[in-house]
């Protein structure tokens, strides 16, 4: 019971914190920053925070050779998921993008069933069908217009990357590695993707106001360090599929901030779609 309460609390914290992505990212976009620059600073600031936590707990940074490759792959998957999600904000409302992202539990369940032969429960299948129905409602608005195809594909790419990460944490040697250490190296290796893209483009946008730096720090703390820590620990405790399915608060948080702060519309059709998905 204690373990169940702990995991439940961690999932609430994870969902609430990860749903804050639009809250801190959109003001940075408005100030002229691009997704690569935002994510570079997001990961860069999160890494030392986790390093301090590891040191404060007296843990070692040492990893075994067999853990290096899985950590690199997991890092690149998380970075790719972040990049495609943040790119999608340029094509659709952040609340809708974050809601569409919640198809990743379906992908996790399918991967576990098809690759690792995990039996799909009837309730899981029903949940998957309801989520697909919700996506259908979101894809076409009440005025007949459809969501951006590019934006939708970007969100689905983000969902797939995140789903593979959640499965990978539980199906590799990383399952028995300390959560803090896994998260630290995942973000460290993930940072390399944004470094490479920035070196290729030759452009790194930096904030020109103190409160924008505060936004970057908040991005590093809440939807990055805290969220990924809780996700990794939950996967190690209860497995990939339950962790994914228990993430219902994530899109709710994103939609709440999108509507209340950024003036995104909340129609009956959108509400029905969100309810079906979560």
Positions of PLM-derived features:
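Juxtamembrane helix-loop-helix junctions in multi-pass membrane proteins
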Residues: 16-45, 164-189
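Hydrophobic alpha-helical transmembrane segments of multi-pass membrane transport proteins
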Residues: 16-20, 24, 53, 72-91, ...
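Hydrophobic residues within alpha-helical transmembrane segments
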Residues: 40-45, 69, 73-76, 103, ...
């Amino acid at each position: 019971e204690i373990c169940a309460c702990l995991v439940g609390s961690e999932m609430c914290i994870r969902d609430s914190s990860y749903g804050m992505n639009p809250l801190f990212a959109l003001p940075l976009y408005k100030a002229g920053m691009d997704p690569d620059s935002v994510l570079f600073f997001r990961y860069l600031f999160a890494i030392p925070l986790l390093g301090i936590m590891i040191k404060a707990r007296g843990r070692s940074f040492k990893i075994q050779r067999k853990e290096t490759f899985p950590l690199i792959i997991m890092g690149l998957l998380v970075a790719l998921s972040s990049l495609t999600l943040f790119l999608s904000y340029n094509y659709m409302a952040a609340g809708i993008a974050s809601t569409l992202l919640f198809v990743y539990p379906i992908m996790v369940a399918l991967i576990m069933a098809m690759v690792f032969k995990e039996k799909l429960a009837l309730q899981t299948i029903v949940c998957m069908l309801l989520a697909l129905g919700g996506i259908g409602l979101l894809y076409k608005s009440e005025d007949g217009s459809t969501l951006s195809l590019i934006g939708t594909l970007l969100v689905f790419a983000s969902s797939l990357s995140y789903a593979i990460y959640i499965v990978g944490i539980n199906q590799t040697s990383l399952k028995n590695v300390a959560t803090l250490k896994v998260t630290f190296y995942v973000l460290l290796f993930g940072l390399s993707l944004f470094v490479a893209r920035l070196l290729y483009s030759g452009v790194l946008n930096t904030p020109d106001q103190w409160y924008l730096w505060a936004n970057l720090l908040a991005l590093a703390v809440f939807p990055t360090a805290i969220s990924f820590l809780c996700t990794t620990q939950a996967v190690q405790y209860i497995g990939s599929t339950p962790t994914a399915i228990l993430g219902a608060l994530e899109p709710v948080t994103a939609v709440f901030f999108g509507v209340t702060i950024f003036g995104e519309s909340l129609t009956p059709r959108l509400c029905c779609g969100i309810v079906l998905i979560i």
